[in-house]
Amino acid sequence: MADTGKGSSVAGCNDSCGCPSPCPGGNSCRCRMREASAGDQGHMVCPCGEHCGCNPCNCPKTQTQTSAKGCTCGEGCTCASCAT
């Protein structure tokens, strides 16, 4: 039986995290829950530290505004989470 690790939360791979779907496997294709300070709700982040759904790891960072408030994606990014 796999050890899930108490206190950690891992979401499945999806476009919002900049991961290929279906996932090829491995730690590079995971979202991780990061707890915010002062009891605030945690944020989902890619292994590279980017916020899921805003700057998918496989998309370059630019200031292109998307339909999601405050999110940016690189020009030419084809991730569904970057669609306007």
Curated annotation (Swiss-Prot):
Q: What induces it?
A: By abscisic acid (ABA) and jasmonic acid. Down-regulated by gibberellin.
Enumerate the residue ranges of region (Disordered).
1-26
Q: Where in the cell is it found?
A: Cytoplasm; Nucleus; Cell membrane
Q: What does this protein do?
A: Metallothioneins have a high content of cysteine residues that bind various heavy metals. Functions as a metal chelator of copper (Cu) and zinc (Zn). Plays a role in storing and distributing Zn ion in seed.
Would you indicate the residue range of the signal peptide? none
Q: Which domain of life is it from?
A: Eukaryota
The protein's matches in InterPro entries, at most eight in alphabetical order, are given as: Metallthion_15
What is the name of the protein in this document? Metallothionein-like protein 4A
**Which species does this protein come from?**
Arabidopsis thaliana (Mouse-ear cress)
